[in-house]
Amino acid sequence: MSLFDERIPYKPFEYPEYYTEGWLKQAQAFWLHTEIPMSGDVKDWNEKLTIPEKNLVGNILLGFAQTECAVSDYWTQKVVSWFPKHEIQQMAMMFGSQETIHAVAYSYLNETLGLENFEAFLQDDATMKRFNNLVSYEGTYKVGIGKSLAVFSAFAEGVSLYSAFAVLYSFQLRNLLKGVGQQMKWSVRDESLHSKMGCKLFRHMCEEDDKLLDDCREDIIAAATTMLKAEENYIDKMFESGDVEGIKAYDLKQFIRKRLNEKLQELGYFDLGGYFKFEEAAASRLDWFYHLTGGHTHTDFFAVRPTDYSKANEGEDFEDIW
């Protein structure tokens, strides 16, 4: 039995965890942008946000929609073609489908707030380099596939959007942009699951090929270093007008460094937990992000509160709550 051996019959599943922990959990968490009330956000945008804050939020949201399209393509085209197992392919197609929901939802946020220049972020150097870093890793053989999958799952799904997620969600601490904040919460939950299962799939590859972890090591470290530089440049770009109330650029950089270390360990490189130096106190000032989005570390969005991973709105009327 191998991940790369084609199986024609639908069942029995050889790797059932990709159905139960991946496809099923994502299916149970289906949501749409139409469930998110935005009237309060429009009022906040027009009456309460400063010009620098509007520029910050606008630049982030415009980039999100395009990025999610690339992420969706990775799951539905690359992962599906590499692993000829129904349970893995179904999970990948479900994840890719969810990314299209993200893209539509971000587009909805953009249009609701009057942000419709979707090509603007493609002309921005710092943002474009970050975008290219997400989609530039490819592979057509086991080592190449392993490197690509690890980089994509750990860093594209598990790190690259989190600085922007945190910035947007910080407005929630000020009782602003609650619709945007709700979408960030659901998106973080989805991305956390995608990253977790992609990292699991890479570790599964390493279990079946005991040389793979070492063969991929240097390239994965190099990719993590590249990702760090891109993220820090992106953070500088976001904060070019100064720190935002409730969050500082320096703290966010430490938060990202800590996440990179955690993701390296999640891939199986347990000796790299301290590879990127960071200030613990500064990184910990972002702990509110995990608490508000439903988890307490980068891996336990579902383990701590498993009932959270079900139908997204759970019958709540968010207009009544807010």
Give the positions of each predicted feature.
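Non-heme di-metal
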Residues: 1-322
